[in-house]
């Protein structure tokens, strides 16, 4: 059985073996095939769900699939906001590829993916100007609060660090404003529907 084999070769060897397995197919190709088979003009959320189950059951690299799923629960996008199933499928592919990446590369890939740009509104984010426009702070706030350092400084034990009985904030409003300035200018080339360019 699989469990007996893991016991025999050891956890470290099994993990290395799992991440060396090639990804058999992409969610994007599975979603497009599913939509085409059902006679749909585009892919929808149910096609993405079908793809996720297909890969979860059939992919030999089960560890990669499970890590990608766990990452999708942290770096959340919505098929309600991102209305093209190809976008969500491509996003799952990106998480699958980066399942064993370092955190810096993963966070960059998440930040640059159009699905996240649409969901947390930094796609097309513009710099401040003289009219009073300021950069959208939504993604910057989520990067700090949910995707990295969190609201409060923590001890090595994971408990909140206290100073004079009070928790210590890890960032403030000025930090968010500064980071929001970094996340401006992201956009994309949107080819026509007949274009061969794969824009997801």
Predicted regions and their residues:
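Active-site substrate-binding loop specific to GH73 endo-beta-N-acetylglucosaminidase modules
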Residues: 4-37, 44-53, 84-200
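Amphipathic interfacial helices
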Residues: 44-48, 58-66
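Mature N-terminal segment immediately following signal peptide/propeptide cleavage
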Residues: 1
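Short, flexible active-site-proximal loops enriched in glycine and acidic residues
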Residues: 63-67, 79-87
């Amino acid at each position: 059985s699989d469990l007996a084999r893991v016991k025999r070769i050891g956890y470290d060897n099994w993990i290395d073996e799992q991440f060396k397995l090639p990804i058999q197919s992409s969610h994007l190709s599975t979603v497009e095939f599913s939509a085409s088979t059902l006679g749909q003009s585009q892919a929808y959320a149910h096609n993405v769900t079908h793809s996720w189950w297909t890969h979860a059951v059939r992919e030999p690299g089960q560890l990669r699939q499970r890590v990608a799923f766990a990452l999708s629960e942290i770096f959340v996008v919505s098929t309600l906001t991102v209305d093209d199933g190809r976008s969500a499928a491509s996003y799952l592919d990106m998480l699958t590829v980066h399942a064993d990446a370092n955190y810096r590369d993963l966070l960059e890939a998440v930040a640059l993916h159009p699905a996240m740009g649409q969901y947390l509104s930094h796609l097309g984010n513009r710099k401040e100007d003289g009219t009073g426009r300021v950069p959208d702070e939504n993604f910057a706030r989520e990067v700090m609060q949910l995707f990295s350092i969190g609201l409060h400084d923590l001890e090595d034990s994971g408990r909140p660090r206290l100073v004079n009985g009070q928790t210590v904030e890890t960032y403030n409003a000025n930090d968010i404003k500064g980071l929001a300035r970094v996340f401006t200018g992201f956009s994309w080339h949107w080819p026509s529907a007949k274009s061969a360019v794969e824009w997801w």
